[in-house]
Design a protein with these regions (language model features):
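A short, N-terminal "cap"/entry segment at the start of jelly-roll beta-barrel domains
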Residues: 1-56, 142-176
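Conserved short histidine dyad/triad with adjacent acidic residue
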Residues: 41-48, 56-74, 107-111
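Short acidic-glycine-tyrosine-enriched beta hairpin
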Residues: 53, 80, 89-111
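Conserved catalytic motifs of the protein kinase core domain
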Residues: 57, 79, 123
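"Short basic amphipathic alpha-helical interaction patches in structured regions
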Residues: 63, 75-77, 95-103, 142-144
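Short, conserved beta-strand element in jelly-roll/cupin
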Residues: 63-65, 74-90, 129-131
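A generic structural signal for short coil/turn motifs at secondary-structure boundaries
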Residues: 70-73, 91-92, 115
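Ligand-binding loop in jelly-roll beta-barrel domains
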Residues: 95-100, 108-139
Length: 176
């Protein structure tokens, strides 16, 4: 079979195999201003880029105001974090400071408390790919809430509507 190209309604080409009617999957582009940041109310602003509801994976960009501390949580799956700006660390590991350009891998089962130093010059900007859920813990280590792909998408859509008048932001959603 040979590759041919046809036009999609958007005018962008999509590749097809000759003799088939099914198109190859195409890449989905989201520019930084396609999805709004929402104020989560605790010194964080979230931009949910992608969720795979079947696999339980959520991809987001988060900005943290100086002095922000996020509730202690345990991950049920692996997390990848890439710091774009600013600096942050886990209270449990104060010497391991994430700065612009740093990559962090968190294995499933890791427990920590994210903290952004109050003396940061501006917001800290981090890109996360999270597999599974965050089990949010109280001071005794008991689970008080769960954050996962489903809840992140639901809350993000709600906050987009409340804060920006956008009820259906163009989050890339798989596995729905």
């Amino acid at each position: 079979m040979t590759d041919t190209t046809t036009e999609r309604p958007t005018g962008r080409p999509t590749a097809r195999l000759t003799g088939t009617t099914a198109a190859h999957p195409t890449a989905i582009l989201r520019r930084s201003d396609d999805l709004p940041f929402v104020d989560a109310g605790d010194g964080t602003h979230l931009q949910v880029l992608q969720v795979d509801l079947a696999a339980g994976v959520w991809t987001l960009r988060t900005t943290f105001e100086p002095g922000t501390t996020i509730r202690t949580h345990r991950h049920t799956g692996a997390v990848h974090a890439f710091t774009l700006a600013g600096r942050w660390h886990y209270l449990e590991y104060p010497d391991d400071v994430n700065e612009a350009g740093s990559y962090l891998f968190e294995p499933a089962g890791s427990v920590h408390t994210l903290h952004v130093p109050a003396d940061n010059d501006g917001p800290t900007d981090v890109f996360f790919i999270i597999h599974g859920a965050n089990l949010n813990l109280d001071d005794a280590g008991e689970v008080v809430s769960v954050t996962d792909a489903h809840s992140v998408l639901r809350v993000y859509r709600s906050l987009c509507g409340q804060q920006h008048g956008v009820d259906d932001p163009p989050v890339v959603v798989h596995g729905a």
